Amino acid sequence: MAISIPGTAREAWPALPLAAWQDTCATLHLWTQIVGKVRHSQSPPLPHCWSDTLYVTARGLTTSPIPSGTRVFEIEFDFIDHRLLIHTAEGAVETFPLEPQSVASFYRRLWGSFGRLGLEIRIYGLPNEVADPIPFAQDERHASYDADYANRFWRVLLQADRLFKRFRAQYLGKSSAVHFFWGAPDLAVTRFSGRLAPVHPGGIPNLPDRVTRDAYSHEVSSCGFWPGGGAIEDPAFYSYAYPAPPGFADARVEPAAAFYSKELGEFILPYDAVRTAALPDETLVAFLQSTYEAAANLGGWDRASLDKPRP
């Protein structure tokens, strides 16, 4: 009997209309904020909030190892078996199901697990970058979890992570890892010119300006994927420069489906344009490369020393 192994292009790039899982997306966003804040509270601070992020795994999202005194633990979202797992370096494991439950319930379950593992964790208990934030411990409003769409979201992150890493490998200058920022939320990778940037004006809802100014302390060209909402209703890839050089908004970029959003101040490539393309990988990479070139060329970056020479 033949065994069917997932991995076709259609399965790799699943449909992800935000309207079909908007409540789940909002709930999962807040769950990742809680877990991300755990990493933030325990980790030595790196520039640009790099010590706060999550990372894509073959099963979901992870914090990577987190110190707690001399102990080390790790938290993982498993979007295949739909569980949250907390592993310690001593071999102990705590787990509970990812299922329809309120943010407050998720919060209580996680801290119950910490207690049984002997971990004392404190975080700032309000969400960031969301309007009208509700304290995690009191949020009974957000309580949705559609396992199918959570899995689809992760599968999209898998593909974006894979291609973002390919793109990152072509740069010799300072670059971030490919990482999941739980504030927006988005998966992102950022290249740096090496020059200081003008002080960022800040003003992001429920995010201290000092955090924003640290994130944008130096010139960047950044790209990423986010599930949609607000000015862009459905999932999309994006690319922006800070500061945006003159002419950036009018630059010609690839593919034809990409466009510049004046409201967001960045280039947008709808996810469906990639998902339905004959060559999804090439379509996304063309967007990443052409928008970077627009930022770097118009911004006068030293590409001769920053770009990896092509063989």
Region spans (language model):
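Conserved aromatic-histidine-acidic binding/catalytic patches
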Residues: 16-19, 23, 94-102, 141-155, ...
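Low-complexity, glycine/alanine/valine/leucine- and proline-rich hydrophobic stretches
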Residues: 213, 218-268
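Long, hydrophobic/aromatic-enriched structural stretches that serve as scaffold segments
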Residues: 55-133
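An N-terminus-focused feature that recognizes amino-terminal "leader" regions
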Residues: 1-86, 93
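Glycine-rich, often proline-containing surface loops adjacent to acidic residues and nearby aromatics
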Residues: 82-95, 128-148, 235-238, 263-272
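Aromatic/basic-lined ligand-recognition segments
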Residues: 138-226
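TerminUS-proximal long segments
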Residues: 2, 26, 259-311
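Short conserved micro-motifs at the rims of enzyme active sites and ligand-binding pockets
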Residues: 65-67, 249-254, 279-283
